Amino acid sequence: MLVLISDLHLGDGTTGSSIPTSAFQLFAKRLRLDAHFASAQGERYRPIEELDVILLGDILEVLHSNRWLYAVGDETRARMTRPGESDYIRPWSDPTDPKYAAKLLEVTRAILEANKDSFEIMRKLASGEAIEFDAPDEHGNRDRNSDKKIPLKVRFHYMVGNHDWYYYLKGGSFDVIRREIIQALGLSNLPEPFPFDLRKMDKNFPWEEDSAPAIRKLFEEYRVFARHGDLHDKFNFNRERGRGYPTLGDLLGVEVINKYPEVLKTMPGIDPLFAQNPSESADVRPGFAAPLYVKAQLH
């Protein structure tokens, strides 16, 4: 059984609210029901042995965190960093700068903490604690009275999109971050760069296909193919260089959508409630419609 999910945008709470834990509880319930339904097709009862969930990008909302506006470790958020300053770091900065991985780790840990109850549900699904089947009897029928249960471990596979492409970056410092994500979400990924594209749409594209053999095997087995849709968005994907590079969308997200509410908070005479409302513009899709949302708030 294969399930694909994308665009959960689970953030650290600094620019908007994430979907509640109750949504994950409902997801686990639906997944359990579907697994049981798939195990009892026709007159035969055969508990399924595999259930894979592909997280198809923009699962963790890394881009829309106002932590990018401040120095690494600055929890006071009293002063935004500026270009040219020694503590300045943004998604489009040089990823080999030690501050880059440090800031990404800071943002990632904040996201994992803010959504820890939701991720606990994922871990229980992955460990086999959330879905189990009645064992079949000697005739292959479902034995509802049997004390023996067959647990099903859900395998979660992470692929990146344009709001979490930072987990595609190579290097030991980024492997450390990915390990924390794997542990927190119960992923089946290795700590190497999370994949983006397993089949180039155009052979002339300059980047290489990602390997990800486990995901590739699923695509072949189920005769499907999937990638995040940013490949078709020129503002959020660089077709000349590939997924491991920043785009105009990163700049808009940090310096406009994230920054505007933070600037309002520092202006005298601004109602704190009004200053908070524009932070929800991070949830506006597409991102370029955010100014329309802000204009509506002004009225």
Predicted features and spans:
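Extended recognition/assembly regions associated with phosphoester-bond processing machinery
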Residues: 1-299
